[in-house]
Amino acid sequence: ISLNSHSSSILQINKEHTDAAPSAAFVDKEKVAIRKLDSISTAFDPFKKILLKIDTQGFEKNVLAGAERLIEQKVKIIQLEMSLLPLYEGIVPFEEMVSYLNRLNFKPLFYSPGYVDRTTEQIQQLEGYFIKNK
C-alpha cells in the first residue's frame, strides 16, 4: 500500500518512482485474494461486448493472462495503463505489452499521457486503448 492509494500495487514499487513521487512511498502491506476474470466471465451477458479497463499498477499483463477466454469471446476494447519506465518490480515494458496485445488480436487505437514526472516533464506512463482486429 502506498501513501497515495492510486500508486498501491501488488508489485513492489521502485525507488525511481518514489523519488519522482514521494507520495507513492510504501507504507503498509495487505493480503488480498486474486481471482482470474475468466473464473467469473459467465456472469457477463454473452450478447454484450465489453470494454475492459485495467489499472493495476504494473500487474496488467497478469490480469490479461487471467482473462484470455473473456477477451477472446466478449471484449471489444481494452484500456490499460502502460509504463515507459520500470516503476514497479517485474513490470512489463511498454513494447512487450503492445506485442502481447497484438498476439491477443488487438491493435492500438490511441494513447494518451498518463503519469508525468513534474520535475523532468518525462511521461512515465501512458493510457493505451486497443481495439480487437476484425
Locate each region found by the language model.
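Glycine-rich adenosyl-binding loop in Rossmann-like folds that engage adenosine-containing cofactors
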Residues: 1-35
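Conserved acidic-Pro-Pro-aromatic motif
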Residues: 40-134
